[in-house]
Amino acid sequence: MVRYTVDELFHLKPTESLPVQFDAEEFKAIIEKVKQIQALKEEEFNAHGGHFNRRRSSHHHHGRPKVKHTKPKVTTDSDGWSTFEAANKKVNEDEESENVSVAVVPETLKVKPNNKNISSSRPADNKDIIADKQTHSFNAFAALESDEEEET
């Protein structure tokens, strides 16, 4: 087959007659082969959803999921008053709470100090940590009685 340079291909025009050396059948066979290869590539591309083994991005989840809430039942009396009906779940929970007795066990709470925030070099003692406990209480009646005793 005769090979043409790029410049020669630009100068060729479809209205001109082809030179004697040009083999049109072989050229058409090459074009058909390229068309078949291109069709196979497009078919494979479309079979995979328009991408070649590309990971799907998680960017397509934009909003919150839609939660379907059921509308409460509204009953209207003969007087024209509208009231909401209570849900059945609340009734079931009340019945279960009556059947099950809850055992309350006193828990001992161990307080662990956070030594990295304490500026002292010695570790904190558990007795020092519980500072919220009131050491002595003020009794107003006892104070009044002591004042009266001092005056007499």
Curated annotation (Swiss-Prot):
InterPro entries: Caf20. GO terms for cellular component: cytoplasm. Residues 114-123 have a biased composition (Polar residues). The keyword Phosphoprotein applies. GO terms for biological process: filamentous growth; negative regulation of translation; positive regulation of cytoplasmic mRNA processing body assembly; positive regulation of translation. The keyword Cytoplasm applies. Residues 46-133 are annotated as: Disordered. Residues 51-72 have a biased composition (Basic residues). Disulfide bonds: none annotated. It comes from the Eukaryota. GO terms for molecular function: eukaryotic initiation factor 4E binding; translation initiation factor activity. Keywords: Cytoplasm, Initiation factor, Phosphoprotein, Protein biosynthesis, Protein synthesis inhibitor, Translation regulation. It is found in: Cytoplasm. Residues 124-133 have a biased composition (Basic and acidic residues). Acts as an inhibitor of cap-dependent translation. Competes with eIF4G1 and EAP1 for binding to eIF4E and interferes with the formation of the eIF4F complex, inhibiting translation and stabilizing mRNA. Belongs to the CAF20 family. This is Cap-associated protein CAF20.
